[in-house]
Amino acid sequence: MGNTSSERAALERQAGHKTPRRDSSGGAKDGDRPKILMDSPEDADIFHSEEIKAPEKEEFLAWQHDLEANDKAPAQARPTVFRWTGGGKEVYLSGSFNNWSKLPLTRSQNNFVAILDLPEGEHQYKFFVDGQWTHDPSEPIVTSQLGTVNNIIQVKKTDFEVFDALMVDSQKCSDVSELSSSPPGPYHQEPYMSKPEERFKAPPILPPHLLQVILNKDTGISCDPALLPEPNHVMLNHLYALSIKDGVMVLSATHRYKKKYVTTLLYKPI
């Protein structure tokens, strides 16, 4: 004898089980679906999968990198002198500032010199002298974990404060915008015309004190023939010439060395 529908419903309520109703498609109703907690950490992956986070993360990191790059001011290059005094025929310079590539040094007497513009900070370098790597023992050195010894140099901004101040002063002094490029007054383009009287003008008269030169004086009998009288100071550093006699021209010049006077005579045949 079968149970009625009312009896089956009472038995199901007592057992605490309720059969969900299904629609024509075979799925449960929307009201019977499990609820998802939006703030639950277990459910975070449902809304933020790796496929969605990867592009956003890369875009954020790229934006942050650009922001940091803009905030950092580029280090100013400073002229730095490298000098090798250990002799040699061919000397090269290599360092961390040029990926350890060889840079030839210029010979300056007994030394080899190079001037490079390096950014501020710490730099390591080494010399390549006649086919052998070496360092300068007179300069600061640093030893790596592999035992390699390199020279080290610190390029500091404070070492160039004097040069920066001089540069600022020179820039201020070079501002000549308020000055005129030419003297004031009228200008014209007429060519200069020499006058006939200026073309045939006689040379100026010789000053009288230049007439008393040593070549025109006779040496006294009481004087030493190897010594000449002391000349006047206005006669120094001038070139004098005697009248041509017997086909010979005599030139003379007097110079002073400390307390002595030296007169040179040049005899030239004509």
From Swiss-Prot:
The glycogen-binding domain may target AMPK to glycogen so that other factors like glycogen-bound debranching enzyme or protein phosphatases can directly affect AMPK activity. Residues 1-44 are annotated as: Disordered. The modification Phosphoserine is found at S5, S6, S24, S25, S40, S96, S101, S108, S182. A lipid is attached at G2 (N-myristoyl glycine). The modification Phosphothreonine is found at T4, T19, T148. Keywords: Fatty acid biosynthesis, Fatty acid metabolism, Lipid biosynthesis, Lipid metabolism, Lipoprotein, Myristate, Phosphoprotein. The keyword Lipid biosynthesis applies. The gene is Prkab1. InterPro entries: AMPK1_CBM (IPR032640), ASC_dom (IPR006828), ASC_dom_sf (IPR037256), CRP1_MDG1_kinase (IPR050827), Ig-like_fold (IPR013783), Ig_E-set (IPR014756). GO terms for molecular function: AMP-activated protein kinase activity; protein kinase binding. Residues 68-163 are annotated as: Glycogen-binding domain. GO terms for cellular component: cytosol; nucleotide-activated protein kinase complex; nucleus. It comes from Mus musculus. CDD domains: E_set_AMPKbeta_like_N. Belongs to the 5'-AMP-activated protein kinase beta subunit family. Residues 9-36 have a biased composition (Basic and acidic residues). It holds the Pfam family AMPK1_CBM. The modification N6-succinyllysine is found at K201. Non-catalytic subunit of AMP-activated protein kinase (AMPK), an energy sensor protein kinase that plays a key role in regulating cellular energy metabolism. In response to reduction of intracellular ATP levels, AMPK activates energy-producing pathways and inhibits energy-consuming processes: inhibits protein, carbohydrate and lipid biosynthesis, as well as cell growth and proliferation. AMPK acts via direct phosphorylation of metabolic enzymes, and by longer-term effects via phosphorylation of transcription regulators. AMPK is a heterotrimer of an alpha catalytic subunit (PRKAA1 or PRKAA2), a beta (PRKAB1 or PRKAB2) and a gamma non-catalytic subunits (PRKAG1, PRKAG2 or PRKAG3). Interacts with FNIP1 and FNIP2. This is 5'-AMP-activated protein kinase subunit beta-1. Phosphorylated when associated with the catalytic subunit (PRKAA1 or PRKAA2). Phosphorylated by ULK1; leading to negatively regulate AMPK activity and suggesting the existence of a regulatory feedback loop between ULK1 and AMPK.
